[in-house]
């Protein structure tokens, strides 16, 4: 069985081919049973973190399952909040084919999915990117978005300014025009694409800040209690999702619905429908578009297949 650690997994998932692989699997489809999310309690009964189990398979090809842990309190101990492992098997025999670093796979396929969505939903001339958050996933947003839009300027905001400054510095080392910002409202108003990748449980981006033509990419929340944008963002936007699962699990949408600002019938399409040409993306330059992703095992399988095939070549 092939073993790919974090560095090897990253090397085998360059963003342009990964975006193409995701597009292809969204078009062809695969079997994706409901994922399981389990809250892991502390001894006092409060929630320490969550464990996610995400299987998917293509009959006659490969099957895979990812186990991911998300423990936000880890950052206070100098640890990553996200850990995971992915196992790829032969769907005909069940023979294990490869083990990949789940956190690296998750990070890269997540931002690649956002970039794939932006290829349909962001304005063609979108060049100003705002990254909200400074964690593992945020580190790769600019690279992925640059594959689909002419990103020329990146700004970074984080609830801890030091995190934003550190990420902006790393981006500058890679040749990106990047700066950390303190004023989130002003940064949102200046951006063409706003990409949020946090574990926030309260709204960070307010709808009144969004100017016409903005694309809002919401990556972080995956439970009903989490949200990165307020209800006004959802009310003003043409909403798209990575899958229908977002309607049941994304706090950004569920809490907006509770406020009367959103209903499931208002979703303009899923990413699969966009990729298959079944739904139109952005209609004009003045629309505000919103893409909410919660992740799916299809996305993991596409990345794992690409990494495994590349390692065999």
Report the location of each language-model feature.
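N-terminal ligand-binding/catalytic initiation module
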Residues: 1-107, 115, 125, 269, ...
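Short helix-loop-beta connector
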Residues: 121-128, 211-212
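NAD(P)-binding Rossmann-fold cofactor-contacting core
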Residues: 148-174
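Adenosine-phosphate binding glycine-rich loop
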Residues: 226-313
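Conserved beta-strand elements of the Class I
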Residues: 128-130, 289
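Glycine-rich Rossmann-fold phosphate-binding loop(s) that bind the pyrophosphate
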Residues: 134-135
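N-terminal Rossmann-fold NAD(P) dinucleotide-binding loop
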Residues: 138-139
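Rossmann-like adenosine-cofactor binding region
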Residues: 174-261
């Amino acid at each position: 069985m092939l073993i790919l650690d974090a560095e090897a997994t990253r090397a085998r998932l360059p963003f342009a081919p990964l975006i193409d692989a995701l597009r292809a699997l969204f078009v062809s489809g695969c079997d994706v049973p409901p994922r399981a999310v389990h809250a892991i309690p502390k001894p006092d009964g409060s929630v320490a973190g969550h464990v996610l189990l995400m299987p998917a398979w293509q009959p006659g090809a490969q099957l895979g399952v990812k186990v991911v842990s998300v423990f936000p309190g880890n950052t206070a101990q100098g640890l990553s909040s996200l850990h995971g492992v992915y196992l790829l098997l032969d769907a005909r025999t069940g023979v294990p084919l490869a083990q990949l670093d789940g956190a690296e796979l998750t990070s890269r396929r997540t931002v690649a999915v956002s970039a794939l969505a932006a290829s349909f939903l962001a304005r063609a001339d979108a060049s100003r990117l705002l990254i909200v958050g400074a964690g593992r996933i945020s580190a790769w947003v600019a690279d992925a978005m640059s594959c689909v839009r002419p990103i020329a300027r990146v700004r970074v905001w984080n609830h801890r300014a030091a995190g934003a400054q550190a990420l902006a510095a790393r981006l500058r080392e890679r040749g990106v025009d990047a700066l950390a910002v303190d004023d989130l409202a002003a940064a949102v108003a200046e951006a063409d694409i706003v990409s949020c990748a946090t574990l926030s449980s309260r709204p960070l981006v307010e709808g009144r800040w969004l100017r016409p033509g903005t694309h809002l990419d919401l990556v972080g929340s995956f439970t009903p209690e989490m949200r990165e944008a307020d209800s006004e963002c959802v009310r003003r936007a043409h909403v798209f999702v990575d899958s229908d699962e977002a309607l049941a699990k994304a706090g950004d949408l569920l809490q907006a619905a509770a406020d009367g600002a959103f209903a499931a019938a208002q979703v303009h399409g899923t990413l699969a429908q966009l990729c298959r040409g079944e739904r139109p993306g952005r209609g004009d330059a003045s629309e505000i578009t919103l893409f909410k992703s919660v992740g799916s095992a299809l996305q993991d399988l596409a990345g794992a297949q690409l990494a495994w095939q590349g390692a065999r070549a």
